[in-house]
Curated annotation (Swiss-Prot):
Region named Disordered: 74-113, 152-172, 393-426
Tissue specificity: Transient high expression in pole cells during embryonic stages 8-11.
Protein keywords: DNA-binding, Nucleus
Function: May have a role in germline development.
Record's compositionally biased regions (Polar residues): 84-94, 158-171, 396-412
UniProt family annotation: Belongs to the ETS family.
Protein name: DNA-binding protein D-ETS-4
Species name: Drosophila melanogaster
PANTHER family cross-referenced by the UniProt entry: ETS, SAM POINTED DOMAIN-CONTAINING ETS TRANSCRIPTION FACTOR
Cited PROSITE patterns: ETS_DOMAIN_1, ETS_DOMAIN_2, ETS_DOMAIN_3, PNT
Amino acid sequence: MEYEKMLYMPAASEMPHSPQLKPHQFQAHTPTDQYSSYADNFDLSLLPQESASIPTTVFQYNAPQIKVECAWDSQPIQQQQQPTAPYTNPSSHQLIPPPAYPHSAYPSPQSSPLQSEFAAYGLGRFGGSYDSLNSPSPSLEAVSIKQELHILPPSPPESNCETPSPRSSCGESIKAEPLDADIESLIDLNSLLQQQSLQSPQNLQDTKPDHQLLRECLEDTSFQKRHNLKPLALESFIGGLAEVRGDFEPVISLALEHAKREADAICAELQISQDPNGWSPAQVHAWLRSTLAQFRLPPVADLELHFCENGAALALLSEEEFVRRLPESGSTLHAQLEIWKMAYADQPAHQQHSQQSASTDHWPASYAMPHLDLDYNEDSEDDDDMEADAQVAPLNGSTTSPPATNASNGGTATVKRPNGGRTGGGGSHIHLWQFLKELLASPQVNGTAIRWIDRSKGIFKIEDSVRVAKLWGRRKNRPAMNYDKLSRSIRQYYKKGIMKKTERSQRLVYQFCHPYSQ
């Protein structure tokens, strides 16, 4: 450019209003021409003609001069590119700055061959290895791309159309993870733990019937063996809770019917009453031997020495006393006796009176109520119509008084004396205080309803007043019986000297007077 300016610069004499400069002045102020050596050797034929375009444009360069189409297998190109290889490939991860001249002013050169063609050429000729010297356009980008194909893991087939990069390779390595996740999902610890937790209750349920069957065999009776029934608490047979009896009402009814049939057959064979309280000592011994033979228990030779009581006293013995006298068969005998008592208590009152009229009733001396002249019957006790004056005679029964006549029904009502006298009215009936002591004599059955607090002093407590009232109403065949009526009868005993209030007044706690506490 400086040279062209010098060619077109006019002479000093031609410039208007320019002072004449001397040669020594020009040399002093003008620097030495740096292009003088180039001007001497410059070939003017290289300058463009007048019809040509401006020399500063780059349109003079044609695309075929840059892109060498037939230089792929030429050895001279390899020789020319060998010295430049160290310069062009110092590092595969560095970028060369753009050229100094404005690159945007020039048209972009033609694109290099496609990556697929370039890869096919490299793999076909060099067996998969890349040679930077044989590249048609040895640029940094091409060298970097080909090196990444060998350094990084291969891309999946669907990504061959894109330029591989470290980021894309990492992305495809992540895509392969779902396959491992699918394989690992075959072993799910949560599902295994859940299955184990579900199987454990089933195992318990599977083993439970075995233990339950063992209990049934240990606590079984003849009726349960025949009908394969589960053992029930004896409380449910004689009242118990209302909901328990409601659920097992059919089973209870069937069991009582079976017990009644067995009792009828044994009573007909032994000529005894169904009420254990009416048995004599000889009848007690006959029933014990029959029960031992029925359940195939060891026979007892001296049975009369072990049990010398009559039926009423036998009914008051506890299970511990039975076991103490007969360790091998005492528990079974006591359980069978309780079943007989329940079967008899479930019968209507008129059947009980008819059965008792055919047998004698023997109460022990401690239960023998002294002679009382009463002008009331048992039903009037429940209705709070007790207006009579009770006169208690000596315990030996030496003095007696004629029985009083009940004006309401025209019959006589007398209480049994210690000498075993019969009661009037065609049959005997149990009194409330006797019934309470009968319940107290069976704590295994009635312990949740009534219990002793101090047996020596005759103090007891009614734990379940509703249940005691129901049992008393069943015994007297009075379905409308409740505890209010029963408590009125108990208060009447205060006037007769049969019961009294305790020293420390407590609710539902009562005390028998002497000799009724014995």
